[in-house]
From Swiss-Prot:
It comes from Mycosarcoma maydis (Corn smut fungus). Residues 333-410 are annotated as: Not essential for B6 function. Residues 202-224, 278-335, 373-393 are annotated as: Disordered. This is Mating-type locus allele B6 protein. Residues 1-110 are annotated as: Variable domain between B alleles.
Length: 410
């Protein structure tokens, strides 16, 4: 554009044509030049517009160029805004697609998980986002849908199981971070800092030759694991610290892959649910307390008092004829009073009438037999011998009856 302080319509038209031509070429290096030319033209035009000749044809051409420039600028601005919007949509859609692929398609190092487990997709997502296992709302909805679809394909074992909901999945991730030991590692080896935990997990995966989770943001490569651990602990790393971290890491990975309850299968849950009694309507729900959880102490049953009733027993006192076989002796409780002191005289009197009984009506045969027939056809044991061996003349003189009666009435 001319530097002449006087501005004519022809020069003004020439300047606009030049600007239009360069603007439509749309070269990046020409943009500052176009801005400078437009600024100069804007400054000169108000000063000379009153002195310009009235040429309708030139003025019409100037209006046409200005209109074309305005339309071109609006189109370029619309294209630029549309490009920015489309780029943002493409990035967002690509991110969602990658997340769904990462959730649905297991990685190579994690394919030892069983797809029959109810929490398969949740565990898979936990392993894939081990550096930050905090799923977004969209990821939660995707995991709920995938879990319910996979559970519905299992069959009869999930007939009575309600579908998974988003709040249940949120609670599962909270419990998983705590029970697996992820929160413990975060507290002990990362100072409860998620950024340090992310750096630590990536360093551990890199040292184990495992693929690190993808990140949309550009981050510097992970440092050595020992360096990261030492920095997080704030002191030199010891062998005990390294071993403790390795043990906690192995325990965490084992829990995430297999868990504790899901190692045995769903049939255990079905069996436990079937064994529970259905509570009656209106009955309060039993609450397990500490006293109920502890098994009752087994106490020794109280010993029964021994009976004081004397058992009938045979007398150990030798009989009159000790040379005879003692196996033929019979013990009767009625007439054992001669050798047992706890049999009352009334019992003896009720069962045997002494007034009608003569023990020596058979002569000396009574002394040769261990038993004799009493009234009522009862066999009665012979009276025990308490004195020395009796002489035949003493038996003939009748001393034995008084001796037996004296013992009977004692």
């Amino acid at each position: 554009m001319s530097r002449d302080p006087k501005l004519s319509l022809s020069k003004f038209l020439e300047c606009l044509n030049e600007i239009e031509h360069e603007f439509l070429r749309d070269k990046v290096e020409h943009r500052p030049v176009l801005v400078r030319k437009l600024q100069e033209l804007q400054q000169k035009t108000p000063k000379h517009v009153t002195n310009l000749p009235n040429d309708p044809e030139t003025i019409q051409q100037i209006h046409q160029i200005a209109h074309r420039l305005e339309v071109a600028v609006k189109v370029f601005l619309h294209i630029d805004r549309k490009f920015v919007s489309l780029r943002s949509d493409v990035v967002e859609d690509t991110s969602k697609a990658l997340q769904e692929v990462n959730v649905a398609s297991p990685a190579v190092e994690y394919r030892n998980l069983s797809e029959d487990l109810p929490a398969y997709h949740m565990r898979k997502h936990f392993l894939h986002t081990l550096d930050s296992p905090y799923p977004t709302q969209e990821e939660k909805e995707t995991l709920v849908r995938l879990t319910n679809e996979s559970t519905a394909r299992v069959g009869q074992s999930s007939v009575n199981r309600p579908p998974l909901e988003v709040h249940q999945l949120t609670l599962w991730f909270i419990n998983a971070r705590r029970r697996s030991g992820w929160s413990h590692i975060l507290k002990k080896f990362a100072r409860e800092d998620r950024s340090r935990m992310k750096h630590l997990v990536r360093a551990k995966l890199s040292s184990s030759n495992q693929s690190t989770p993808p990140s949309l943001t550009s981050e510097k490569p992970s440092d050595d694991l020992d360096v990261v651990l030492s920095d997080n602990l704030g002191r030199p790393l010891t062998l005990a610290d390294k071993q403790q971290f390795e043990d906690d890491w192995a325990s965490m990975i084992s829990w995430i892959k297999y868990g504790v309850k899901e190692k045995v299968g769903d049939w255990v849950y079905d069996l436990c649910a079937a064994s529970k009694k259905t509570p009656k309507p209106g009955m309060p729900r039993p609450v397990t307390t500490v006293a109920k959880r502890q098994p009752a102490r087994k106490t020794k049953p109280a010993a029964k008092p021994k009976s004081r009733t004397a058992n009938p027993r045979a007398s150990t006192t030798p009989s009159i004829d000790s040379t005879l076989d003692s196996s033929k002796l019979e013990s009767t409780p009625e007439l054992s009073m001669c050798s047992t002191a706890d049999t009352s005289f009334s019992t003896f009197g009720s069962s045997l009438s002494m007034s009608h009984y003569d023990p020596f009506q058979y002569g000396n045969d009574i002394l040769q037999s261990p038993t004799f027939k009493a009234r009522g056809n009862r066999k009665v044991k012979a009276l025990p011998k308490r004195a020395g061996k009796q002489q035949p003349d003493e038996i003939d003189n009748g001393k034995i009856p008084f001796f037996c009666l004296s013992i009977a009435f004692v």
